[in-house]
């Protein structure tokens, strides 16, 4: 039973690491493209900023969903019931 709990914690940690890495890469690409497009067409900067914040919220949602799934696996582990 301890091996299942250990594997679940390691899996949840890997899930959180990949979600954080993906979110960081997404924010970096988003910020770079926003600055590039704002420099190219400054008159569209306010419209682009609104769209950038919407996409940033969606990117952040990916990490929050990963946190929720990890907490589910850590505290309400569905795999332990298979052992009993």
UniProtKB/Swiss-Prot annotation:
Q: Which InterPro entries match?
A: ATP_synth_csu_bac/chlpt, ATP_synth_F0_csu, ATP_synth_F0_csu_DDCD_BS, ATP_synth_F0_csu_sf, ATPase_proteolipid_c-like_dom, F/V-ATP_Csub_sf
Give the transmembrane ranges: 9-29, 54-74
Partners and quaternary state?
F-type ATPases have 2 components, F(1) - the catalytic core - and F(0) - the membrane proton channel. F(1) has five subunits: alpha(3), beta(3), gamma(1), delta(1), epsilon(1). F(0) has three main subunits: a(1), b(2) and c(10-14). The alpha and beta chains form an alternating ring which encloses part of the gamma chain. F(1) is attached to F(0) by a central stalk formed by the gamma and epsilon chains, while a peripheral stalk is formed by the delta and b chains.
| Site-annotated residues for Reversibly protonated during proton transport | 60
Instruction: Work out whether the entry's keyword set contains Transmembrane helix.
Output: yes
Mainly localized where? membrane
* Compartments where located: Cell inner membrane
Query: What PROSITE patterns does the record tag this protein with?
Result: ATPASE_C (PS00605)
Per UniProt, the keywords (alphabetical) are:
ATP synthesis, Cell inner membrane, Cell membrane, CF(0), Hydrogen ion transport, Ion transport, Lipid-binding, Membrane, Transmembrane, Transmembrane helix, Transport
| Gene Ontology annotations for the cellular component aspect, listed alphabetically | plasma membrane; proton-transporting ATP synthase complex; proton-transporting two-sector ATPase complex, proton-transporting domain
* Record-linked SUPFAM superfamilies: F1F0 ATP synthase subunit C (SSF81333)
Q: Does the keyword Membrane apply?
A: yes
| Similarity section | Belongs to the ATPase C chain family.
Annotated Gene Ontology MF terms? lipid binding; proton-transporting ATP synthase activity, rotational mechanism
User: Which Pfam families does the annotation name?
Assistant: ATP-synt_C
Q: What is the species of this protein?
A: Actinobacillus succinogenes (strain ATCC 55618 / DSM 22257 / CCUG 43843 / 130Z)
Q: How does it sit in the membrane?
A: Multi-pass membrane protein
Q: What does this protein do?
A: F(1)F(0) ATP synthase produces ATP from ADP in the presence of a proton or sodium gradient. F-type ATPases consist of two structural domains, F(1) containing the extramembraneous catalytic core and F(0) containing the membrane proton channel, linked together by a central stalk and a peripheral stalk. During catalysis, ATP synthesis in the catalytic domain of F(1) is coupled via a rotary mechanism of the central stalk subunits to proton translocation.
Q: What is this protein called?
A: ATP synthase subunit c
